[in-house]
């Protein structure tokens, strides 16, 4: 009798666990809306911070860049940015250290930017892997007046990606406007430059984990 009760109790606990796991996991039902950054009207891109329906988090930022062009930013990242001192010029307070991985001269896609920087007052050690814009847009929106830079953002000290990001720099009168978009909570195990299937995905992309 006691054995039967234990079996029933054990089965019940397993059922509760599986149901809890099932209800906690959601697919990415909020689209990575990179196209939003390509709005034509100057100043129309909306800065915002908000939780999406699948519990991932969206951060959108608009930065005015007087006397700067999209091509200048392209050259800065593709060729000029080589040292931690250069990196600090971009943000003297928050940017601390940098290095490159898989970087080729005059190329940015396929390279990974290894950085230490403060984010909200806390030190973040990140691996920012720049990818071809087709991964986000399904096409390449780069042209003479637009520089598009997209990336998978991961932890530097562990083979795990945690976010997606996209910067769009567009020429406007008197300079450029940079539209930045970050999708936080896209978790994936990483091997080299490839994202791989792993239990990390199952746990990291659960609704509860994204919330907390």
Give the location of each predicted region.
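Beta-strand/loop substructures that line and gate deep hydrophobic ligand-binding cavities in soluble
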Residues: 146-207
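Short, intrinsically disordered, charge-balanced linker/junction segments flanking boundaries
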Residues: 209-212
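Short beta-strand-initiation
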Residues: 5-9, 58-60, 164
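Glycine-rich portal/gate segments that line the openings of hydrophobic small-molecule binding cavities
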Residues: 94-159
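A generic structural signal for short, solvent-exposed coil/turn residues
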Residues: 51-55, 141, 161, 170
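Hydrophobic ligand-binding cavity/cleft-lining segments
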Residues: 23, 27-107
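Glycine-rich loops and low-complexity Gly/Arg-rich segments
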Residues: 87-89, 114-115, 203-206
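N-terminal Sec-pathway targeting helices
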Residues: 1-17, 21
